[in-house]
């Protein structure tokens, strides 16, 4: 999938869905150095969050079958710096990049409400956008 996306940058994909009864627009744009993700119910950017995956930290039990522990750096660049936007940013990073992706993500998010159910809907929509094959 990454090879298909990297071949002809930038690639933009968009969709819309009803989430909790509210029309929600989605846009994902892949550039050579980062990914831009827009999730809005207000037709504007809202809060802007920068998310990067830090270098993996090897755990002492990794030799016995443990896994790498990834950490993330999230920074609100514009808007309300609420803890929920850091959580949304990290989860959106994972959904749009895939498990092994490391490209920094810039998330613009404007929602009427937030909850675990709304986040699940957003992640599902973004994963389907990521999986769409390019023409």
UniProtKB/Swiss-Prot annotation:
Keyword terms, alphabetized: Chaperone
Keyword presence, NADP: no
Species this protein is from: Nematostella vectensis (Starlet sea anemone)
Source organism phylogeny: Eukaryota, Metazoa, Cnidaria, Anthozoa, Hexacorallia
InterPro entries hit by this protein: Proteasome_assmbl_chp_3, Psm_Assembly_Chaperone
Record protein name field: Proteasome assembly chaperone 3
Function: Chaperone protein which promotes assembly of the 20S proteasome. May cooperate with psmg1-psmg2 heterodimers to orchestrate the correct assembly of proteasomes.
GO aspect biological process, one term: proteasome assembly
Entry similarity comment: Belongs to the PSMG3 family.
